Amino acid sequence: KDGYIIEHRGCKYSCFFGSSSWCNKECTLKKGSSGYCAWPACWCYGLPDSVKIFDSNNNKCSKK
């Protein structure tokens, strides 16, 4: 599956212009095929179904 990867709080992995190599690394560490910085967050391709991705209908992002 494709989507924005999220961290433990449910927030997207933030990125900035020029950080596509960092996003690609984070995506492949999660067993995705590749990824890039779709500013302001990392977008991944080919993620396994077990990896949680951002869902705007069920956004649990918090600052806690």
From Swiss-Prot:
It is found in: Secreted. GO terms for biological process: defense response. InterPro entries: LCN-type_CS_alpha_beta_dom (IPR044062), Scorpion_toxin-like (IPR003614), Scorpion_toxin-like_sf (IPR036574), Scorpion_toxinL (IPR018218), Scorpion_toxinL/defensin (IPR002061). Residues 1-62 form the LCN-type CS-alpha/beta domain. Keywords: Disulfide bond, Ion channel impairing toxin, Neurotoxin, Secreted, Toxin, Voltage-gated sodium channel impairing toxin. Its main location: secreted. GO terms for molecular function: sodium channel inhibitor activity; toxin activity. Disulfide bonds join 11-61, 15-37, 23-42, 27-44. Expressed by the venom gland. CDD domains: neurotoxins_LC_scorpion (cd23106). GO terms for cellular component: extracellular region. Pfam families: Toxin_3. The keyword Disulfide bond applies. Has the structural arrangement of an alpha-helix connected to antiparallel beta-sheets by disulfide bonds (CS-alpha/beta). Belongs to the long (4 C-C) scorpion toxin superfamily. Sodium channel inhibitor family. Beta subfamily. This is Toxin Tce3. The lineage of its organism: Eukaryota, Metazoa, Ecdysozoa, Arthropoda, Chelicerata.
